[in-house]
């Protein structure tokens, strides 16, 4: 293998997570990946620290926007098309957290400790804003529009789609119609979709 070989992680990478900056564990894992004989690529999932991830400078790489975490550990941003090995790869990370039915707590809420204690006692699924949940888990309108614009450049035809979550059309089949067909899946001609 060489650095021109790619391992692609379909979201929930976990290598950029600690709220206080890069921890010793993260440094160790990221340096280990960077030292491998391949390049690690990832799209974001819904369990990412978006404050830290989005703080990396945006760079162009193989035709699309990325965050370079290390020289060979690269976040493929949403709505981008990358040309690798003469293949067109459309990336669109993110997803809606399903483990937040009890809500999102605000750490600066005066009743935070009480609310957390009640939820913990009842084993209720919740998240804490900017600690283990970020609104950026879902794509912004700007990211959606950029994805559509980039797809139009390629006449809505790509070889691969890399995402974190399955298409809403797949969810619709599995959920007995609970989800509606999404705009992108209805327009794109694709050979393979990885999620």
State where each predicted segment sits:
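Proline-aspartate-enriched helix->loop->beta-strand connector
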Residues: 158-163, 181-195
């Amino acid at each position: 293998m060489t650095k021109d070989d790619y391992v692609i992680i379909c979201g929930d990478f976990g290598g950029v997570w600690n709220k206080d900056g890069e921890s010793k564990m993260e440094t160790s894992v990221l340096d280990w990946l960077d030292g491998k004989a391949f390049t690690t690529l990832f799209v974001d999932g819904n369990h990412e620290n978006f404050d830290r991830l989005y703080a990396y400078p945006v760079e162009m790489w193989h035709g699309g926007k990325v965050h370079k975490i290390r020289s060979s550990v690269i976040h493929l941003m949403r709505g981008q098309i990358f040309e690798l090995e003469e293949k067109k790869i459309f990336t669109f990370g993110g997803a809606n957290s399903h483990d937040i039915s009890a809500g999102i707590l605000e750490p600066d809420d005066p009743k935070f400790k009480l609310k957390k204690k009640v939820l913990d006692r009842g084993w209720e699924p919740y998240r804490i804003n900017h600690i283990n949940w970020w609104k950026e888990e879902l794509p912004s309108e700007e990211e959606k529009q950029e994805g559509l614009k980039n797809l139009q450049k390629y006449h809505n035809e790509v070889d691969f789609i890399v995402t974190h979550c399955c298409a809403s059309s797949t969810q619709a089949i599995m959920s007995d119609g609970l989800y509606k067909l999404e705009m992108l899946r209805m327009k794109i001609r694709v050979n393979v979709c990885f999620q």
